[in-house]
Amino acid sequence: MARPSGRLGHNTRGTGSSSSGVLMVGPNFRVGKKIGCGNFGELRLGKNLYTNEYVAIKLEPMKSRAPQLHLEYRFYKQLGSGDGIPQVYYFGPCGKYNAMVLELLGPSLEDLFDLCDRTFSLKTVLMIAIQLISRMEYVHSKNLIYRDVKPENFLIGRPGNKTQQVIHIIDFGLAKEYIDPETKKHIPYREHKSLTGTARYMSINTHLGKEQSRRDDLEALGHMFMYFLRGSLPWQGLKADTLKERYQKIGDTKRATPIEVLCENFPEMATYLRYV
């Protein structure tokens, strides 16, 4: 998708709406209908009024208790224009919100999984794996760990777009620098960390409260690949009275499930999970 002509960066003019009452982000982007939501706030369809191109606009309340949009914007800038990294067109205020304008993408891997009756062939999963291991390698090369592997966070390009076959990685709100920018050293090993990520896919060490590193992203990818191959994972659907107890049960079941059982009939996936 071509880059809109508007400036990419912080909005020093503070525009949030026009005199006509249309909600705007910066001088270019008109805010449209809601197309999604999350812990950060909501996702809106937007339009670049100079180019007539559609965009995605993430809105986060300025009074958010745990603001992460500006950090996510910084991480996108750190990642640059690598394959499968969405373009970020703008960051700035929008009324009572902080707004980030991004390239509009197509459906997620979870959407496609549903469309395929929740069955992906081995060939399809291997094609996905090749792209996503490469994508994660690129993220790691920029001194970031992702920490939020789930099918909903991997999107193909829009239909008819030249990037339609490219799987993009989105949502860096939980990402973290694993190389200290001052010392240039790997962050220290720590324990008793709170859980970060999606319990279904996160690594066993994450359940154990250990500081995440690159291997945890790769293990989480392995769990996601097996989800696609099996249709579900052994630790799905566990009942518990509280979220904490449920996370504990998921972690216990992961540890109790041998890799050979998880990856039955897929020995190469077992080799991958043992390796990471």
UniProtKB/Swiss-Prot annotation:
Its EC number is 2.7.11.1. Testis. Residues 29-276 form the Protein kinase domain. Residues 1-21 are annotated as: Disordered. One of its GO terms (biological process) is endocytosis. It comes from the Eukaryota. The active site is at 148 (proton acceptor). InterPro entries: CK1_Ser-Thr_kinase, Kinase-like_dom_sf, Prot_kinase_dom, Protein_kinase_ATP_BS, Ser/Thr_kinase_AS. Keywords: ATP-binding, Cytoplasm, Kinase, Nucleotide-binding, Serine/threonine-protein kinase, Transferase, Wnt signaling pathway. It catalyses: L-seryl-[protein] + ATP = O-phospho-L-seryl-[protein] + ADP + H(+); L-threonyl-[protein] + ATP = O-phospho-L-threonyl-[protein] + ADP + H(+). The keyword Membrane does not apply. Residues 12-21 have a biased composition (Polar residues). ATP binds at residues 35-43, 58. The keyword Cell membrane does not apply. It is found in: Cytoplasm. Coiled coil: none annotated. Its main location: cytoplasm. GO terms for molecular function: ATP binding; protein serine kinase activity; protein serine/threonine kinase activity. GO terms for cellular component: cytoplasm; nucleus; plasma membrane. Casein kinases are operationally defined by their preferential utilization of acidic proteins such as caseins as substrates. It can phosphorylate a large number of proteins. Participates in Wnt signaling. Belongs to the protein kinase superfamily. CK1 Ser/Thr protein kinase family. Casein kinase I subfamily. Monomer. Triazolodiamine 1 is a commercial name for 5-amino-3-([4-(aminosulfonyl)phenyl]amino)-N-(2,6-difluorophenyl)-1H-1,2,4-triazole-1-carbothioamide. This is Casein kinase I isoform gamma-3. It comes from Bos taurus. The gene is CSNK1G3.
